[in-house]
């Protein structure tokens, strides 16, 4: 109904949202949670993890880009380095699609703060102070006692900048997929895509297929 009222082209298939959710979760688990646990424990050094959540693109030709693209991979670089498109100093097809002029001030506020964290870290390995004092402390990853582990970067129009602790495990992801109200074939397709490229051994992947939904999925 909202799509028709706003004359937007919407992704109506709920499977798209479910598929995107678990692809993102598997990426976070394998590329952030696991290595952060290992590095912070083994090396006894501070690890700073983040999630970029900005999704305030324009609706372009009726396409809901905030839903279709969201905070896509690498998009935070424009904010860290304050790109010309973000500043409104470069107008081309991509920038006009990506950045909503009505959100310019909040985009720039987020960009400035992100850049300051990065400068601080480059200065002395601590993103929180010198030369810039930051109002939200970016705490190092700590897997003990359910501590806050990573910072989320978003504009004040949404979550803003804040620390979070929702970490993932392989079991939590697989259980989530299993509990979704989609077909078995769709669940198996998600599993196939998740393990299409993996650092797990063939034996480990085979064991996952054997145990997931009582072996209803066949490895592609």
Indicate residue ranges for each PLM-predicted region.
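Flexible glycine/proline-enriched surface loops and loop-helix/loop-strand junctions
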Residues: 14-20, 97-101
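Low-complexity, intrinsically disordered or weakly predicted helical/coil tracts enriched
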Residues: 10-13, 28
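Mobile gating loops/cap/lid regions near enzyme active sites that modulate substrate access
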Residues: 30-220
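Single conserved hydrophobic/aromatic residue that forms the stacking wall/gate
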Residues: 1-11
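Alpha-helix capping and helix-coil boundary motifs
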Residues: 12-18, 183, 201
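Helical cap/lid subdomain of alpha/beta-hydrolase-fold lipid enzymes
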Residues: 19-31
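Alpha/beta-hydrolase
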Residues: 8, 20-22, 55
